Amino acid sequence: MDIYDDKGLQTIKLFNNEFDCIRNDIRELFKHVTDSDSIQLPMEDNSDIIENIRKILYRRLKNVECVDIDSTITFMKYDPNDDNKRTCSNWVPLTNNYMEYCLVIYLETPICGGKIKLYHPTGNIKSDKDIMFAKTLDFKSKKVLTGRKTIAVLDISVSYNRSITTIHYNDDVNIDIHTDKNGKELCYCYITIDDHYLVDVETIGVIVNRSGKCLLVNNHLGIGIVKDKRISDSFGDVCMDTIFDFSEARELFSLTNDDNRNIAWDTDKLDDDTDIWTPVTEDDYKFLSRLVLYAKSQSDTVFDYYVLTGDTEPPTVFIFKVTRFYFNMLK
């Protein structure tokens, strides 16, 4: 679950099992604590626990510029019927791209009770899962009825990227467009291909998601949006299926990038399990049309080069001029 305020800043983030990789490590830190309901333990800034938390937040939060984590971890224990009062917040963010949070990681979940209650303007939220919530929100830990609750609490500060532009989606929503990939799930690539005797398509547009899958958006026939959903597992497959001028290309050679780069993302951060977004509504298609027009208008000044090499003898080199814009679609 992701909840945002009226400025578009995230106020609540519910996690699933993202912190399982460090949960036991945090438990080990506090395994000898038996006679205290709350204790604080300073950590090294570059400790594995802090670094892993930072990596998870960079991956799971959207549009992030910087994540700072206070190196002190607070361990809190709640036994049955402990009385916990509502904690009121008077913290106010100083800018519209910065927020401070409490990150709560469960180390022991009670059998009954003990949920965290957040007082949110749109309705109260209760959770017994790992959660990060803005310090602008009042909160309360509900009574534990059966079992015990132990949690680790960390202070998190997040600076968000400012968008380079927004593109109208519908009467209520505009979508931020960025040149920075951190925290984004999709990348639109407006691609111009150097003249080559094997190339049939000289301009093409694809959306690439975090798995490297590509959705064909527009092709050389113009800036009109391709309505049939043509999804490829990689940009190399887009070349074979759409860009090249002959159907036998896949049988004659394969394509690689000498630097092991993906056309949109850092290859070491690809997530194979991510499904690609596809347009469904009229608003989706209108948004894509506006995105293509904007990318085309910027393609002479905002671009990079991407090279694929065919394993022929001698090697065949294909040079692509790529304008990239990163964004997140509504969920």
Swiss-Prot record:
InterPro entries: Poxvirus_C4/C10. It comes from the Viruses. It holds the Pfam family Pox_C4_C10. Belongs to the poxviridae C4/C10 protein family. This is Protein C10. The lineage of its organism: Viruses, Varidnaviria, Bamfordvirae, Nucleocytoviricota, Pokkesviricetes.
